Swiss-Prot record:
Gene3D superfamilies: Acid Proteases. It comes from the Eukaryota. Optimum temperature is 55 degrees Celsius. Thermostable up to 50 degrees Celsius. Retains 60% of the original activity after incubation for 30 days at 50 degrees Celsius. It comes from Nepenthes gracilis. Optimum pH is 2.6. Retains 95% and 79% of the original activity after incubation for 30 days at pH 3.0 and pH 10.0 respectively. PANTHER family: OS04G0448300 PROTEIN, OS07G0603500 PROTEIN-RELATED. The keyword Protein biosynthesis does not apply. Residues 95-430 form the Peptidase A1 domain. This is Aspartic proteinase nepenthesin-1. The keyword Protease applies. InterPro entries: Aspartic_peptidase_A1 (IPR001461), Aspartic_peptidase_AS (IPR001969), Pepsin-like_plant (IPR034161), PEPTIDASE_A1 (IPR033121), Peptidase_aspartic_dom_sf (IPR021109), Plant_Aspart_Prot_A1 (IPR051708), TAXi_C (IPR032799), TAXi_N (IPR032861). Residues 1-24 form the signal peptide. Disulfide bonds join 123-126, 129-203, 150-168, 155-163, 240-434, 354-395.
Length: 437
């Protein structure tokens, strides 16, 4: 049902936009520079390794390595000392967004990141820039570029803004030594045939620790005022991620197009942390393997409102799903008990738990895996939690986090319609053939 509805919507409208008079809300107050309100459009997403001549094993190995690096960044955000000058953000990711910037429009690609807010790309003049496949953006060559004054509310929305000649300056660190520094400005961003003026973004002139062929910047999709959804004043977006190795692009729908998608049950309540308000925390009550409800106290997944520890976030950029250690060990042991196949070392491919598959594949029985959310039970398809990096091997696409926070990763979300509705504080899920025409 959801798959056919999703395909119908994509066939109906590749790109849709409607403009209406802005209305006065606290969010649109931050968007006072916009003359019209964008209510809906689509963006195509490509996997960062799409089109590369890589084997399935190499694709998984690279994705897990990126995911592990991202996990370290996320954990650094939780453990960063208060009052530091440079804030730490998630960065990195698995899906690229193709867009253009400036007038005339100059194409570039950027990571879609639900774990951070800032939109940024590399800019000239560059003190330190990494290689990118498209020319580095030169704001002096764009008739629609403006610098952002220090008095701007979106400048003040930065956690550690600085000021130089009344120009707003930013520094974003990513926990592993990667960092982008530069000036804040406003510019026209173009998605397909849709051009949106006066988007606030970071013009990165000193960018260290990036440059692995993964785009020329980042588009923050988090919950803060600097993110793309917040600047567009949309409270809904959805994506449908195609599997790793697929040549078919994924789709991101914002605003009214996402409003048109009814994902239905199951769903989960969104929670916002006062310590890290960017993240999309969800409400998970328990896990089941096969018919066994695991003896995991719901507090293992609860966000501590006092100090911001714990909880589980849904994230587009982390490859595997990570549970706090006691929950993960319970999942791990139950799969070992129920699958009853030889356990083999999968560390060379980045997995903690792998099994040797029987010579006759029909003898392989994979237990079901269910996530018990407060708004219903999500039973994942087996290919979303067991994957085969090579012949004769299947591996659990999960791991253990060390800092008390769990992460619902993107392998578990593949071929699934995921709808974020911040207006109603809910995330919904529905099975779908992502990328189907």
């Amino acid at each position: 049902m959801a798959s056919s509805l999703y395909s119908f919507l994509l066939a109906l409208s590749i790109v849709y936009i409607f403009v209406a008079p802005t209305h006065s809300t606290s969010r649109t107050a931050l968007n006072h520079r916009h003359e019209a309100k964008v209510t809906g459009f689509q963006i195509m997403l490509e996997h960062v390794d799409s089109g590369k001549n890589l084997t399935k094993f190499q694709l998984l190995e690279r994705a897990i390595e990126r995911g592990s690096r991202r996990l370290q960044r996320l954990e650094a955000m939780l453990n960063g000392p208060s009052g530091v000058e440079t804030s730490v953000y998630a960065g990195d990711g698995e899906y690229l967004m193709n867009l253009s910037i400036g007038t005339p429009a100059q194409p570039f690609s950027a990571i879609m990141d639900t774990g951070s807010d800032l939109i940024w790309t590399q800019c000239q003049p560059c003190t330190q820039c990494f290689n990118q496949s498209t020319p580095i953006f030169n704001p002096q060559g764009s008739s629609s570029f403006s610098t952002l004054p220090c008095s701007s509310q979106l400048c003040q929305a930065l956690s550690s803004p600085t000021c130089s000649n009344n120009f707003c300056q930013y520094t974003y660190g990513y926990g592993d030594g990667s960092e982008t520094q530069g000036s804040m400005g406003t510019e026209t961003l173009t998605f397909g045939s849709v051009s949106i003026p006066n988007i606030t973004f970071g013009c990165g002139e000193n960018n260290q620790g990036f440059g692995q062929g993964n785009g020329a910047g980042l588009v923050g999709m988090g919950r803060g005022p600097l993110s793309l959804p917040s600047q567009l004043d949309v409270t809904k977006f959805s994506y449908c991620m195609t599997p790793i190795g697929s040549s078919t692009p994924s789709n991101l729908l914002l605003g009214s197009l996402a409003n048109s998608v009814t994902a239905g049950s199951p769903n989960t309540t969104l929670i916002q942390s006062s310590q890290i308000p960017t993240f999309y925390y969800i409400t998970l009550n328990g896990l089941s393997v096969g018919s066994t409800r695991l003896p995991i106290d719901p507090s293992a997944f609860a966000l501590n409102s006092n100090n911001g520890t714990g909880g589980i976030i849904i994230d587009s950029g982390t490859t595997l799903t990570y549970f706090v250690n006691n929950a993960y060990q319970s999942v791990r042991q139950e799969f070992i008990s129920q699958i009853n196949l030889p356990v083999v070392n999968g560390s060379s491919s980045g997995f903690d738990l792998c099994f040797q598959t029987p010579s006759d594949p029909s003898n392989l029985q994979i237990p079901t895996f269910v996530m018990h959310f407060d708004g219903g039970d999500l039973e994942l398809p087996s290919e979303n939690y067991f994957i085969s990096p090579s012949n004769g091997l299947i591996c659990l696409a999960m791991g253990s986090s060390s800092q008390g926070m769990s992460i619902f990763g993107n392998i578990q979300q593949q071929n699934m319609l995921v709808v974020y509705d911040t207006g109603n504080s809910v995330v919904s899920f529905a099975s779908a053939q992502c990328g189907a025409s």
